[in-house]
Amino acid sequence: MESGHRFDAQTLHSFIQAVFRQMGSEEQEAKLVADHLIAANLAGHDSHGIGMIPSYVRSWSQGHLQINHHAKIVKEAGAAVTLDGDRAFGQVAAHEAMALGIEKAHQHGIAAVALHNSHHIGRIGYWAEQCAAAGFVSIHFVSVVGIPMVAPFHGRDSRFGTNPFCVVFPRKDDFPLLLDYATSAIAFGKTRVAWHKGVPVPPGCLIDVNGVPTTNPAVMQESPLGSLLTFAEHKGYALAAMCEILGGALSGGKTTHQETLQTSPDAILNCMTTIIINPELFGAPDCSAQTEAFAEWVKASPHDDDKPILLPGEWEVNTRRERQEQGIPLDAGSWQAICDAARQIGMPEETLQAFCQQLAS
């Protein structure tokens, strides 16, 4: 498959479902995982899209990812609930956690959902968008257990994960305002994408094993490993630390330290604490009008008319529209890794080639 090829989202979705069905996932599980991965690619976040498939296959083969498992309620207390993800697909465990949280927010006006011991839960904005679709504000603190890949401010090596932070605010007649990013300067998956493409990452994102700044993504993919840096120096580090505690410790999960280190980089275990709020609770009748007035005010001051000011979440909206029309781009290296993973789990070559022909058409 040539580099720069664009794939039809629906055909790619069918292929992903077939891959996970081949791995042993039940139909609904395969669909939920495919839904999430495709949605990440459509939103422009290829780091959390179908390029994760090889890592998931390795994690499953190593015994870290447990297929056909579900989140289990550990404790329920009114508007608060704690769930054990049971190392299930994060796309399943987080789906179940958000559904329960949204139900509780409808009932109580506010809900707090703590999920621990889940496999990789993917793009956090996806879960926030579910809350926004129900009319709710949500705040998400996420930690990555036992795979340190980010150095603290003034640190010499990795001490914690990329620890995403996410907030969404729903709007009645337009896309929700969405903040969703790793507390590292770039997501780890973006180093994987750059590595496959053979391109550097922006300056200020990485240090090598000796603590020397570099733009070479190989330092996060090949031994000896370097480290990601936090965004905005001490500010990103402080937010990452709070995500580690609120997402990890408060959820009933683990934080990253000597006793919790994982032996495999594919053993991606996430914890997430989510607060879901019905904005109607606050009795702010002018909230929507004030939000729109602010949005219009901010967007009215571009430095360059060819580079419009975007609201939080608007880039994803624009990218989603473009990729739904033109297809999902995928580089040759990533596609080869996905095909190799499909072969590893026993997908017949004729089935794989049939999908390749469909995707190439």
From Swiss-Prot:
NAD(+) binds at residues 48, 122-124, 178-182, 234, 270, 313-316. Its EC number is 1.1.1.-, 1.1.1.237. Keywords: NAD, NADP, Oxidoreductase. SUPFAM superfamilies: L-sulfolactate dehydrogenase-like. GO terms for molecular function: (R)-4-hydroxyphenyllactate dehydrogenase (NADP+) activity; hydroxyphenylpyruvate reductase activity. It catalyses: 2-hydroxyglutarate + NADP(+) = 2-oxoglutarate + NADPH + H(+); 2-hydroxyglutarate + NAD(+) = 2-oxoglutarate + NADH + H(+); 3-phenyllactate + NADP(+) = 3-phenylpyruvate + NADPH + H(+); 3-phenyllactate + NAD(+) = 3-phenylpyruvate + NADH + H(+). The keyword Kinase does not apply. The keyword NADP applies. It holds the Pfam family Ldh_2. PANTHER family: MALATE DEHYDROGENASE, OXIDOREDUCTASE-RELATED. Catalyzes the NAD(P)H-dependent reduction of 2-oxoglutarate, phenylpyruvate and (4-hydroxyphenyl)pyruvate, leading to the respective 2-hydroxycarboxylate in vitro. Shows a preference for NADPH over NADH as a redox partner. Do not catalyze the reverse reactions. Belongs to the LDH2/MDH2 oxidoreductase family. This is Hydroxycarboxylate dehydrogenase B. It comes from Escherichia coli O157:H7. The gene is hcxB.
